[in-house]
Each structure stands twice: as C-alpha cells, then as structure tokens.
Amino acid sequence: MGSTFSGIELGKRSIMAHTDAISTAGHNISNANTEGYSRQRVQLKEFDPLYRPELERPERAGMIGQGIDVQSINRVRDEMLDQRITAQQNQESYWDTRSKYYTMIEQIYNEPDEVSVRSNMDKFWESWQELSMNPESQAARQAVVTRGESLTDAIKSKWENLMGVGSLLNSDIDSTVKQVNSYANQIAALNSEIIRSRGMGDNPNDLLDRRDLLVDKLSKLANITTDQRDPDEFMVHLDGKVLVQGGIARNFDLVSLTDNNGYEKLVWADTREDAFVSGGTLGALIELRDVDIRNEIQSLNTMTMNFSDLVNDVHRNAYGANNVTGLDFFTQHSFVENVNGNFDRDGDGNFDHSYIFRFTGTTTLNPQEQIGFEGVMTFSGPSGNVQVPYHPTDTVETVINRINDSNGEVKAYLDRNNNLVLKGTTAQNVENPDFVIRHVEDSGFFLTGYSGILSASGADGAYDFAHADAVNSLAGAQFAVSPVLNPAGYIEVNNVIKNDVKSVAAAFRDDSGNVNAGDARAAVEIASIRNTKVMIGHERTLDDYFADSVTNVGLKGEQAENNLKSHMAIMNDLRTMRDSISGVNIDEELSDIIKFQHGYNAAAKFVTIWDSLIDTVINRLGV
C-alpha cells in the first residue's frame, strides 16, 4: 500500500508550486513599467508517478500520482519577431537622424534674402552692371566694393553654419561610437554571466531581458544581426563583421584625417582597419558628415573658388581709374605659401607634395579645329586614375567635353584668351585634398605641344602631385596654387581695393596700349560671368548652382521625412505586436494571482486534512 505520509509531500509540492506561480505574477506586476522586461510564466508539470510492482498490481492502479512540479520559469518571447525588429529598427533611427539634421540644413538654405548668398551675389553682379554704364563714377566703384564685402560675408556665414553642423555631427559620432562600444562590452559581459548561470542549471530570464534590451538599443545605432548557432555562444554581427562573440567584444576607435577638416574616420580598435557602418544612427551620422555636409561644403567651396578665380582673371588684366593693374579683386588667406605649390602634407618639416589648383596652357586654340592626332590623357579620379582618349577627327571642343564628362577630378575649359585651362575639383575620397590637380599625363600631343601645358608626353613627362616641385613637368604653363583651407571660409575683397576704390578695374587697354577713362569692357565681362557656364562641378551657370543647391536639399529633406514616416508606421506595428506577446497585462496578472491563491488555499486545506488523517492513525486507533 502507499505511504501514509505521501499526502504531506504531495500537498507540500502543490503549496510550493503555487507559491512560485504567485511570486512570478508579482514579479511581472513589479516590472510592468521596466524597459525591456518580458513577462514570465511558470511551466508546471505532473511530478513523476510511483510505479509499484506488487502482487496485487492487477487488482489496483499501478502508478500513483505524486502531485505537481515546477518545470521552469520562462520568458514569453517571439524570437522571430525580435529578429525582425532588430533588422528593421536601424532603418527607423537612420531616417530619424537624417530628418533631424536636414531640418538644420534647410534652415541654413532658407536664410532671409538680405543675408543670403544668392541675394548678395545678384546685387554684386548688378553693381558691376551699374559700373559698366558709369565707368567714371566713384560711387559705382564704391558700390562694387561694398557689395563685394556683403557677398563675402554671406559666403563665410553660410560656410560657418555648415561647418557648425559638421562639428555637431562629429561630436555626435564620437559619443555614438562610445555608446556602441559600451553596449558591445555589456553584451559580452552578460553572455559570460548567462553561460555561467545556465551551467548551474538556472534559467536567467532577467539577464536575457537585459541582453535583449542592449541588443535593441544597439540595433538603433547600427545595422546589426544576431545568431546563436551554438547554445553557449551568442553572436552579434555588424555589417557582416563580428562585433560580439560570446564573452568577447570588439571595439571601434576614431582616427583624425589630414584632409577632412580634422574630422575622424572609424576604425576597428584591434586591427586598425577602416570600419564601415551602414544604417542606424551611427551610419546616418557618418554619411551626413562625410557625404551630405561634405558635399554641401565642397559645393560652396567650388562655387567660391571658381567664381572668384574668374572675376580675378578678368580684374587682374584690367585697369582701375588710377591706372593700377594686376590686382585680384578677391583674396584668400589660406593658399599654399610656396610659389611652386610645394606643401608638407605629412607634417615632418619637409615638402613632399605639390598643391596646384589650375594650369593654363600657352597656346591659343580654336574650339572648332580638328586636332589631327590621337592619344590618351590620364587624370586623377575618385579611386585611381581615369583615362580620356582623343582621336584625329575630334575638335578641341569635343576633347574638352570628353574630359568634363569623364569621372576625372579635373575639369577643362578655354579661358578668355582661348588658352586651355585645367582645374582641380573637389575630391570624392575624404583622404584626398580638394582643388588639387593630382595627376595629369598624355600619351600624345594634346596636352603637350598642342595646348602647351605639359613639357613631354608619356609617363616621364607626367605631372604628379605626390612629390615637391612637380611644376617642373609643365611647359611654361601658368599655374595657381591651391587653398589649404576652405575657400568659402576665407574669401575677402582685396584690402588694396577696399582702401582705394579707384583700384576697381573696369577698363582694358585699347589696341594702341592706352587706357580710356570711359572704357568699361572689363566691367561688362565680369558682369557677364553671372550667365556664363563656369564649371561649378558641371557646366552650369551660377544661377543654376543656387537653384540646384536649394532643390537638392529640399528633396533630400523630403525623402528623409517620408521614409521616416513609413518606417515609424512599420515599427509601431511591430512594437505593438511584441507588447501584446511579451508585455505585462496588470489585469491578467491579478487574475492569475487570484487563481493561484485559490490553488494555494486548497493545497493548504489538503495538507490540513491529511494531517488529521495521520493524527487518527497515530493517536486514535486505541492500540
């Protein structure tokens, strides 16, 4: 027969099981508002029954139940849903970051008319137009100087605002990288704790919740995926690279760049290799700083560099009312100081590069003339060199267009004297300097004897900026050194002109070499730059530049806002779904507590009854 005391053990197990169930429900209620908490459920099962192989077995039940047992306490989670949220969440934070920063950029472009670059540029051209109609008027010359100063102030103000956004982005990148490193280290530490806990037979639900919360936060910062092929090794991958493997975490570091406004690039701390992050807050911040803001600053610098160079080219060849000539109207205070463009790029005290912005050939060319020979020109490009071929039937204009249509970071045009001009553009790679011609080579004669830029054909006669005195490869061509810093941040009206407005040059010498006080041909030529294709990145006028800039910023801002709304709607649905599965419902937990309380009370009553039965056997049989 069964043990007389077996009922006490059975009742004890029931009381303990219902106690655990009530405690778990209370734990759920306590953490109803805890971020990342998943509700827990007690998994109950029948305790192993007794198998009694006795002689009377055929006449009686052979297996006697022993009550209940707590099998485990588990979190209520949907792993597939969690993985989907992890994959989707980085896109929401990516577009949220872009939307926030494009709001700032749009504010820079939506500045009031009286201080905008475009408005002041229009007034600057109008002042030259007025001077062309009144070349003997000192008031008209003063207007040119005053409006020139207003224009440079507007350009510098816009540059400072864009640089301010860039600095803010750089600061945000720094703090976000620290967050990523912190989350990765915490996840690795939790992995070790979870493995130890499971090794002792525990089910570390709260540790798992903390790890999942960190993964959630990390997925907002970068494009990550998780997997656990080995039950004891939880892994986090970032854009295909291992970030966390079990108890080991990799970290990021930031390294300053010489030619990127002092900004820093992201590298892996252990290997020092470049790290690439797409998606998430960090991916958006890096893209905004190194692509969007960099493009806006480069665009402003390109406009400033080209328009001032064109104005100066006319002005220095013209004469003022005081017969002064050779003056640039605009000056920069940040050009390479060495006359040959030699520059110490690595900071070791020795010249190691040549920073040249513009070459001007020595030969006057006819744009419609067929060149009559063939060859291949080589120019520096975004990643390596770019080759541009030419053929005997090509005209000069065709060859120039082919250069400009190529992916080379050099642009070409014929100047006012029909001499070929090559100019360095902004660099796509952040590690290359802007407005620096890095490589020019010609296997034939177009850039050598025909246009008068290079002294010899082939590799031996090539110009390459990677050493000092590279200008020695030029065939007497004029050249202009490059700016070291941003042209838009340091442009000014020449102090000589500001101190004496008569130095504003509006006239050219006539055929006899005399300067006529009523001549205004230079003023007309400068005023006409407004509607001339001046090679701002592509063949565009200054008006085209301003229209394109505002349109591009507006479209990108609209794109960010629309994509943010779309991803927010998706994420709201996914979070609602997860909350319905893993979230704590107070009413449901209270209902469970009442249910388990009744079970507890019944088990206690059962123990009391069994106690009375034992008391009868022990004390009341009268034996």
Where are these regions (language model features)?
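Structural signature of extracellular appendage/secretion-system components
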Residues: 1-623
